[in-house]
Every structure is written in structure tokens, then in C-alpha cells.
């Protein structure tokens, strides 16, 4: 095709090699307003399309952007494992990729846009061991850039791994085994106040790797502390600039027809001025008056009263004809704008926050363990009005989650689920399958805890952790981290270190001509909505285990980010102190939890342990009540909630692996496994049976005549026997021992 255009660039990782990024347009999906094919080293291939509705969406007071990621099984040379052999609902990995794309993309569109915009990223091909999420951010940005929509991109997204002290861009799965930290950053190029181009960080998603603890404590790797994270974000800026330049080069080769959809502001200037006159002075009295009052969570009710009175007055103005009827829908937005201005000004000028706290104050903390009977572990963590219940369930490793997606990871033994019922905010709403937000929050909490989990060898259990958000007013995800630490310890999980999390906020603005940045610790839901940043940080007392940053600013100065990380560390240590006062070491495992024992057998003995059609292993499970799973390397996991069942199963497994070879004269308490007209077959040890002839059975009843051996012995009955003879073929002849 003659009109195909492309642009490519090289990401230089020094001694770790290079990665080639290529964007192409004009060949595929030509009906979409914007479509781009993105390549990573020529083998991983994504198609991103951006489409826009022709008319504004009716009765919509928000920007209707939808981001979807379509994973195709053929991309990895697979056929779907479902009944219909067709892709179904998106995988968790695809949903998380959608969130990674949406978070930097959404604030880059013009405010007031009401036309539906849909971005679909389809994974067409993926090389083994590759991740596609960071490439998808760039592909979505590029297709939106060439669509002609009002968009302040391009946006560059890069994934970095800290390996041997170097930040490596676009790492492969195999690289992460030697990495301490995994960091995904998105940003865009903007012109700063000095007129120079700079990189605005818009989104950060990061975690310590599963191998981080061993690398740090056994191999001397650098701890991912606050300073190291800052270095990583700064390193990302170089790669983001390169990725943005490639996208801009592609756009410069096209004759773009810019689409200018109508913009619908949330409120008119006249409505804003009227509402401001009604409420501003009263709101200032409320929030400036909080300066000396200390923490007062009920102070927000005063602003609710002000809002209701203002609405009544505005409604009267509509009835009098000063404003038209449609203006009523503008009131909530205008009120929020005035409230936002008042709250931000109060903070910037040194007054108290919305609830009366100081800038670095944490809301009252409370924690308790063992709150739910019969479960394996449970805890409640409360911070202000945010309350989270954590519940832990343990099981055998065969219950670990099997992952059927394009991700290189095929299974995981730690599963974290997060639930956000509508009553947590005092509302009525739908319940059912988890929404994207719930999946994202659960995954963030999961990543915060994975680095401190014991190894499979030290703790051979699958772990399911559930976080129930019972009350929400700011950062239930970080509350989930704290509740989970308590719950896991209560369940007897030997965590390498306790983990706590905190959400930080930021207010920025000019005061007397000077630009000020004020960091807020432990932000409430309102401060999250009215502020400039949502910065969640989780970690141990030594290093950061997970981090998530979203900002509405063009960029966060390095010193502001450094200050936020320092305040987050102080808050994290304070919360950890509360957690360790409640529980500082693993409790005894619950009597209801399975006890899992690990036994190692030679690989060549696996078939013997399983037996023909599973006969041997099933007989052990039936007889002992224990569950048994066998790994390919000969590791056998035996689990039961009753210790004697596990011990009996271990003994039976060992008798197969290291069998006691029957010899003439040896005695066994055997089990009748089959009755025949000529006698009974007795199982001596797993895999070794002998024949107790009917003539010997008659001796057990003083020689009387038997119509059937069933008159004396039944299947499953225990009988003491002695080996009397072993023939040339190894067959065992038995006699009963009185």
C-alpha cells in the first residue's frame, strides 16, 4: 500500500542490548479515525484503533472514554481452552492493561468532550517471554494522536526493571528473575515555565519483584528505597522522550484532518459566579475555622448544609427565570468547583485540611485480629472512616491459580481479591462480578505483599487473601495491605516482614505570585477528588514493595516527589508500629487449616506412586483422608486438617519409595483388597500383594468347610499374616497368624 507510513526508534539499554520500537499506520483498520500498528523488535505486534462517536452522548456529564484490550490466543500460537474454543471475557492481565492505558490517556483529552471515544488495542502477536502492556500505552497514544481528536499527547509509556543497579527498559520475563524492582511509567513532553521541553510524569505503577528479598539479603542487591525509586522515575524520562518523538515523527508524515467536537463545559460562568456568591464565604468560615479544631470527621456535614441551602436558593433563581431549567444540572459541578478552590486555598495558605488535620497527620488507627470464626486467618484494619476486613484461606499448592492468558506467568500461589460493596460508602448499588477498579485494587495489594511471602519450599501452601472494604473514605487499597498483613500473620503465614501502605496527596497553586506545592498525608476521598495527585506507597520498614501514582499536573518537580516519598515513609513506619503492636509474629495455624507436608521422591518412582489409572495414590487418599499432589520434579505435597491423616499418608508414600521388601517369615498387618473363590489377596505395603489361600483361611475357623471366603474375610478388613513362600516369579504366599 502506497500510503503506509512508519516511524521507528531504538531503546538503548547499554550492556543489556537494544529494543526497537516501530509504529506504522495506513495498512490495517483504515476505517477507524485513527489506527496504528506497534511493534517491539518485529515479533510483538499490537493493533490500536481510536474511534469517536459522531454525536455527543445524551444526558452525559462526564467524558465517555472506553479502553479495551483484546488478547488473541493466536498471538501466542494457542487455541483457547474454553468449550467453544473462542476467547471469552478479558483476562485479569488484559483488564490491568486497560487501566494502565486509561489512566494517562483520559486526562489528556480536552475538558467538556462528550462524544464517545473508544480505544481498542488488539494483541496480534507476542514473542515468548515478552510483556505487551507498556507497548500498548504507546500504541493507544499513537492511534489517538493520528485520529485528529483534541488530544494533548503523545504519551510515552515504558516498563523498567532494576537489574544489577541499572534500569533496563522493556525487560523480558526472564530478566525479572534478576531484578529487584519493576516500574512502569507514562508521561508526555510539555513546555515548562522556562520555555524548555520537559517530561510530565502522568502515571507510575511499580512493585518489588518476587525475588527482591533474596536478591537484597543474599546477594547484596540495592534496596528499592525512596531514593532508588526517584532515580527510576528520572531514568524513565529519557525513554519516554524517545517514544514520544517516534510518535510525533509518525504524525508529522500524515495530513491529519483535525476533528473539533463541540465541548460542553460542566457549568456556565454565570452559574459559577452565582453559586460562588452563595457559598464561598460560608465555606471559608468552615474550613479556615478548622485550623485549631484538630481532627473532626463530622466537619464535612457543615458543608453539606451549606450546599443544600445554596441549592434551594439556586432552584428559586431558576423558578424566577434568572436561569433556565437545564441549569439545575450545572449546580453540583459549579458547587464542586467553588469548594475545590476554597479547600485548596486554605491548604496553600497554611490553614487546616477539610477535616481539621495537619498536613502530615494520619487519621486515628485501629486494628484487630481473629475477628471471624473458623476461617484460617482474619483481621480488621481501620483508618478514620476507612475500614477493611482481611480474610486468609490456605490450601494445597494444587489449588494455586492457573493463568490462561498471553502473560508469561502461567500460575500463582498468592491470590488477592478485593471487594467494594456499595454499603461501604453508604450507598445503594449493583453487586456481582468485580469491576475493573476492584480488580486493579486487589492487584495493587497483591503486589505489595508478594515480595515478603515465604518461599514455596518454606511454606508449601496456596494462599487466597480477600479484602472486604466495609467502609470507604480514602485509600481502601492501602487499608487492604494493612489488613492483609495482620490476617496473614494471624493465619500463621511466616511473612519475611510486615507491610503497610499509605496514600499521599498534593495541592499546588500560586500564592502571592509564588508556586507552592503542599503534600498531604493519608488523603480522604474528598481530598483525592479535589487534589492534584493520588500517590499510594506500600512497603516494609526497609524498602518499598509497591507504588502507584496518578497526577493531574503537567509534571511533579523532583523535590516535591522526594518530599512526598519521605512523608509516606514516616507514615508507613507509624502504621507499621500499630500493626506490630497487634501481632508481631505468625500465630499458630488454625485447627481448620490443612497441614501440608512435603516429601521428596525419586522421579522414577512417580509412576509407581500413582499406580495404574491412579489406583495407588487414590487408595492412599481414600484410606487416610489426606490430599496428595505430585510435582514433575518428584516433590509430593500431602495435606490434611488432621495431623494423624498426614502422618499416615507420609508413611504410606515412604513405604512405596523405600519399600520394605517382604521376605519369608516377615509379618504384616495387611488389608484384604480382593476375594476370589480360591482365596483372598492381601495388600502388605502399597504395590505388594500376597495370596492367602482358602486352605489357610479355613484354619482361621478351625478347619470347617467354607462355601466362600467372604464368610470369614471382607474387603477392607485388616488381617495379620506372615510370608510363607516366595515363588520364582516373586508371588507371595501367606499364612494367617493367630
From Swiss-Prot:
InterPro entries reported for this sequence: ExoRNase_PH_dom1, ExoRNase_PH_dom2, ExoRNase_PH_dom2_sf, GPSI/PNP, KH_dom, KH_dom_type_1, KH_dom_type_1_sf, NA-bd_OB-fold
Top-level taxon: Bacteria
Domain S1 motif: 665-737
Metal-binding keyword on record: yes
Top-level EC class as recorded in UniProt: transferase
Localization (cell): Cytoplasm
EC number, as in UniProt: 2.7.7.8
GO MF entries: 3'-5'-RNA exonuclease activity; magnesium ion binding; polyribonucleotide nucleotidyltransferase activity; RNA binding
GO cellular component, one term: cytosol
Ribonucleoprotein recorded as keyword: no
A Pfam family per the record: RNase_PH_C
Gene Ontology annotations of biological process type: mRNA catabolic process; RNA processing
Every KH domain range: 594-653
Keywords per UniProt: Cytoplasm, Magnesium, Metal-binding, Nucleotidyltransferase, RNA-binding, Transferase
Main location: cytoplasm
Co-factor(s): Mg(2+)
Catalytic activity, as annotated: RNA(n+1) + phosphate = RNA(n) + a ribonucleoside 5'-diphosphate
Sequence positions that bind Mg(2+): 528, 534
SUPFAM superfamilies, per the entry: Eukaryotic type KH-domain (KH-domain type I), Polynucleotide phosphorylase/guanosine pentaphosphate synthase (PNPase/GPSI), domain 3, Ribonuclease PH domain 2-like, Ribosomal protein S5 domain 2-like
PANTHER family registered for this protein in UniProt: POLYRIBONUCLEOTIDE NUCLEOTIDYLTRANSFERASE, POLYRIBONUCLEOTIDE NUCLEOTIDYLTRANSFERASE 1, MITOCHONDRIAL
Family: Belongs to the polyribonucleotide nucleotidyltransferase family.
NCBIfam families referenced in this protein's UniProt entry, alphabetically: polynuc_phos, pppGpp_PNP, PRK11824.1
Function: Involved in mRNA degradation. Catalyzes the phosphorolysis of single-stranded polyribonucleotides processively in the 3'- to 5'-direction.
Name this polypeptide is given: Polyribonucleotide nucleotidyltransferase
Organism: Tropheryma whipplei (strain Twist)
Amino acid at each position: 500500500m502506497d500510503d503506509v507510513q512508519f516511524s521507528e526508534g531504538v531503546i538503548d539499554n547499554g550492556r543489556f542490548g537494544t529494543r526497537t520500537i516501530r509504529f506504522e499506520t495506513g495498512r490495517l483498520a483504515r476505517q477507524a479515525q485513527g489506527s496504528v500498528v506497534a511493534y517491539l523488535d518485529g515479533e510483538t505486534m499490537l493493533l490500536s484503533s481510536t474511534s469517536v462517536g459522531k454525536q455527543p452522548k445524551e444526558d452525559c456529564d462526564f467524558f465517555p472514554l472506553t479502553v479495551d484490550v483484546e488478547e488473541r490466543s493466536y498471538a501466542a500460537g494457542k487455541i483457547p481452552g474454553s468449550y467453544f474454543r473462542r476467547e471469552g471475557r478479558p483476562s485479569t492481565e488484559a483488564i490491568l492493561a486497560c487501566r494502565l492505558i486509561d489512566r494517562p490517556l483520559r486526562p489528556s483529552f480536552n475538558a467538556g468532550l462528550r462524544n464517545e471515544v473508544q480505544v481498542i488495542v488488539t494483541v496480534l502477536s507476542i514473542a515468548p517471554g515478552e510483556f505487551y502492556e507498556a507497548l500498548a500505552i504507546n500504541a493507544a497514544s499513537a492511534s489517538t494522536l493520528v485520529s485528529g481528536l483534541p488530544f494533548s499527547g503523545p504519551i510515552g509509556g515504558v516498563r523498567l526493571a532494576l537489574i544489577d543497579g541499572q534500569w533496563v527498559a522493556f525487560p523480558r520475563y526472564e530478566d525479572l528473575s534478576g531484578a529487584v524492582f519493576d516500574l512502569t511509567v507514562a508521561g508526555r513532553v510539555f513546555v515548562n515555565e522556562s520555555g524548555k521541553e520537559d517530561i510530565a510524569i502522568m502515571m507510575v505503577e511499580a512493585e518489588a519483584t518476587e525475588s527482591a528479598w533474596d536478591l537484597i539479603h543474599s546477594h547484596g542487591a540495592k534496596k528499592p528505597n525512596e531514593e532508588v525509586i526517584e532515580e527510576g522515575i528520572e531514568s524513565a524520562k529519557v525513554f519516554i522522550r524517545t517514544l514520544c518523538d517516534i510518535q510525533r515523527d509518525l504524525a508529522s508524515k500524515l495530513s491529519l484532518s483535525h476533528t473539533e467536537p463541540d465541548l460542553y463545559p460542566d457549568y456556565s460562568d454565570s452559574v459559577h459566579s452565582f453559586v460562588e456568591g452563595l457559598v464561598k464565604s460560608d465555606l471559608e468560615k468552615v474550613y479556615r475555622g478548622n485550623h485549631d479544631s484538630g481532627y473532626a470527621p463530622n466537619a464535612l456535614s457543615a458543608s453539606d448544609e451549606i450546599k443544600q441551602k445554596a441549592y434551594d436558593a439556586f432552584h428559586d433563581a431558576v423558578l424566577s427565570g434568572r436561569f433556565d431549567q437545564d441549569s439545575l444540572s450545572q449546580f453540583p459541578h459549579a458547587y464542586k468547583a467553588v469548594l475545590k478552590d476554597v479547600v485548596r486555598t486554605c491548604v496553600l495558605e497554611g490553614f487546616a485540611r477539610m477535616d481539621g488535620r495537619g498536613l502530615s497527620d494520619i487519621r486515628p488507627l485501629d486494628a484487630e485480629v481473629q475477628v471471624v470464626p473458623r476461617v484460617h486467618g482474619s483481621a480488621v484494619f481501620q483508618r478514620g472512616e476507612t475500614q477493611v476486613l482481611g480474610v486468609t484461606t490456605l490450601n494445597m499448592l494444587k489449588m494455586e491459580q492457573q493463568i490462561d492468558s498471553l502473560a508469561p506467568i502461567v500460575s500463582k500461589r498468592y491470590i488477592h481479591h478485593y471487594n467494594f460493596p456499595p454499603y461501604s460508602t453508604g450507598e445503594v448499588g449493583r453487586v456481582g462480578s468485580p469491576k475493573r477498579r476492584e480488580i486493579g485494587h486487589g492487584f495493587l495489594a497483591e503486589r505489595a505483599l508478594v515480595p515478603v511471602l515465604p518461599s514455596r519450599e518454606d511454606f508449601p501452601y496456596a494462599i487466597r487473601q480477600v479484602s472486604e472494604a466495609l467502609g470507604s473514605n480514602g485509600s481502601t487499597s492501602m487499608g487492604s495491605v494493612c489488613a492483609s498483613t495482620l490476617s496473614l500473620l494471624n493465619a500463621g503465614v511466616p511473612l519475611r516482614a510486615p507491610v503497610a501502605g499509605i496514600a499521599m496527596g498534593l495541592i499546588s497553586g500560586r500564592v502571592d505570585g509564588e508556586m507552592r506545592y503542599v503534600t498531604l498525608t493519608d488523603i480522604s476521598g474528598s481530598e483525592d477528588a479535589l487534589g492534584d495527585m493520588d500517590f499510594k506507597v506500600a512497603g516494609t520498614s526497609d524498602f518499598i514493595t509497591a507504588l502507584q501514582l496518578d497526577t493531574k499536573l503537567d509534571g511533579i518537580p523532583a523535590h516535591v516527589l522526594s518530599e512526598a516519598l519521605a512523608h509516606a515513609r514516616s507514615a508507613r513506619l507509624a502504621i507499621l508500629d500499630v500493626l506490630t503492636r497487634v501481632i508481631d509474629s505468625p500465630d499458630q495455624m488454625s485447627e481448620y487449616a490443612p497441614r501440608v507436608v512435603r516429601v521428596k521422591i525419586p522421579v522414577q518412582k512417580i509412576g509407581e506412586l500413582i499406580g495404574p489409572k491412579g489406583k495407588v495414590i487414590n487408595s492412599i487418599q481414600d484410606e487416610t483422608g489426606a490430599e496428595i499432589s505430585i510435582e514433575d520434579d518428584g516433590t509430593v505435597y500431602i495435606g490434611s486438617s488432621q495431623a494423624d491423616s498426614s502422618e499416615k499418608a507420609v508413611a504410606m508414600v515412604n513405604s512405596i519409595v523405600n519399600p520394605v521388601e517382604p521376605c519369608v517369615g516377615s509379618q504384616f498387618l495387611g488389608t484384604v483388597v480382593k476375594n476370589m473363590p480360591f482365596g483372598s489377596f492381601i495388600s502388605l505395603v502399597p504395590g505388594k500383594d500376597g495370596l492367602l489361600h482358602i486352605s489357610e483361611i479355613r484354619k482361621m475357623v478351625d478347619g470347617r468347610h467354607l462355601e466362600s471366603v467372604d464368610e470369614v474375610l471382607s474387603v477392607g478388613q485388616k488381617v495379620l499374616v506372615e510370608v510363607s513362600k516366595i515363588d520364582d516369579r516373586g508371588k507371595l504366599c501367606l499364612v494367617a497368624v493367630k
